[in-house]
Amino acid sequence: MATTFADQAAIAIENVRLFNEIEDKSRQLEEASQHKSQFLANMSHELRTPLNAILGYTELMADGAYGEPSEKMVGILQRLEANGRHLLGLINDVLDLSKIEAGQLELELSDYCIQDIAQTVRSTLEPLAADKKLAFKLELAPALPPGHGDGRRLTQVLINLVGNAIKFTDAGEVAIKADANNGSFYVSVRDTGPGISAADQAKLFQEFQQADNAITRKKGGTGLGLAISKRIIEMHGGRIWVESQPGQGSTFTFTLPVIVERQVEAA
C-alpha cells in the first residue's frame, strides 16, 4: 500500500509539473503574440507615413504642380499612384489586424444611417463595377431605423465585401441588400461570381486564408479583409457568414444589433 501511495504521489507531482510547464509555455506564446502584434502595428505606422507622402507628391506631379507632364508621364504617374494606394490598403489591413490582436482597436460608437453607408459604398466602388460592365444594385428596405455603432468600421466591412464581389465577378451583377428585424440589421452582398466550395468556405474568415483555386490565385489579395470584417462585426455583437455553391455565385451576410451600447471584447 505504501508503494501504491508513493506511486500516486509521484504521478500527482509529475502532473503538477507538467501543468505548470504548459501554463508557462502558454504564457510565453501569448506574450510573443502580443509582441508580434505590437511590432506589426508600429511597423505598419512607420511604413504608412512615408507612403502617404509619396502618394501626395505623385498626385501633385500628375496634376501639373511641378510643370505640365507629358502624356506618357501621366500614365506612369497614374500607375504609380494606383500601386501605391494598393500597397497602402495592404498596410492598413495589417495595421487593423495587429490592433485587433493586441486589443488596441476601439470602436467609435455614434449614430449612423445604414442607407447612407450603402450609398457611400456604391458611389465609391461603382466605377470598378462599371469597368467590368457589372450591374450594381441597392435593395434597401424602406424606413430602416437609425443605427448606433461604428459607422466608419461598418463602411469598411461593406467595402471589403463589395470589393471582393466585384473582383471575383466577371459577368452579371453585384447587389447590396439591407433590412431590419427584431432589433437587428441584416446586410448582405450578393454576386454572380464563380461561387465558393464548402471546403474553402470553412477557412475564408481566417487570417491570411483564401479560397484555394486558380481564380483566387489569379485575382490576388492577402486574405485579411474577411478576417478583419469578421472581427469588426463580432465587436458589434454580430456575426457574419457566407452562402455559396460553385458556379452559382455567393452571398455574404452580416447581422448586428441596431443599437450597440458597448464594444464586445474578443473571447
What are these regions (language model features)?
Residues 23-66:
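Primarily the dimerization/phosphotransfer
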Residues 67, 119-131:
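Short alpha-helical segment within the cytosolic histidine kinase core of two-component systems
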Residues 202-206:
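ATPase catalytic-site recognition across NTP-hydrolyzing enzymes
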Residues 172, 237-238:
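Conserved glycine-rich
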Residues 65, 98-109:
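Helix-loop junction within the histidine kinase core
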Residues 74, 108-113, 130, 135-145:
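Conserved catalytic submotifs in the C-terminal HATPase_c
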Residues 82-88:
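Short alpha-helical segment of the dimerization/phosphotransfer core of two-component systems
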